[in-house]
Amino acid sequence: MWMHNGGIGSWNSGVKRRLVSSVGDRWFSMVQGSTDSEWAFALFLDSLAKLGFDPDGEEYQTDGFGHTTLRKAMLKTIERINGFIKGVPEDVRDKDTRSLLNFAITDGKSVVCTRYVSSQTDEAASLFFSSGTSWKRRGTVKGSAEGKGDYRMERRDRGADIVLVASEPLTFERDNWVTVPTNSTLTIHNQTVLIHPIIDEFYNSSPSFKRSSKFAETKGQITTEMAKATVNDLSRDASTSSLSSAVGAIDLAAG
């Protein structure tokens, strides 16, 4: 399963042609559409194959590829996308070449997600996770449909039996949710959640450095501060329509 939230910079100004030309015939013929998300998946499969792992190999159908391999292929995918953008002549490509690459991939055993922006100064679209041992409904919100209510993550030990990943917190318990840092990977494997920095030209190791949220917001993306503000607002007014919308999303996630 593959997911993408964001967009590849200069997609229709030379990057798409370079990406499409770079993937093997096997992955080229697989793509049925023209979106950057579909072609990014083809590029991921091509990167996985070039690492020596056949995406259709029977030996991987039961145990998967391993989270380390998935992460390597994901990082290679991002590296290649950045390379395609650099390869487009400046007089052809868009003035703004920044990409928002929040990807997610799973082989049925491990999950690897990214929160990434190809910029040294901008914040990526937000990404959060919540982990614990049980996902419980605390009560029914007044006026909501039967079965809908306020949920929270509970933890009885260090294991992560349940891990939820979302672009914004799905509950009003802010302390249930951990922000994935900009330009990082989130890996879920065997009840363990790992976060690794994506160290490239756009990485900033300073914990005090504050990135700008303007770029992601102009692309219609939720940023970390926006998501935090939404949770705080909803927790003060449990009667808002936004609350019902959020609770509905929680039901889908729990189901």
Stretches found by the model and what they are:
Residues M1-G255:
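Conserved short alpha-helical segments that host acidic/polar catalytic motifs at enzyme active sites
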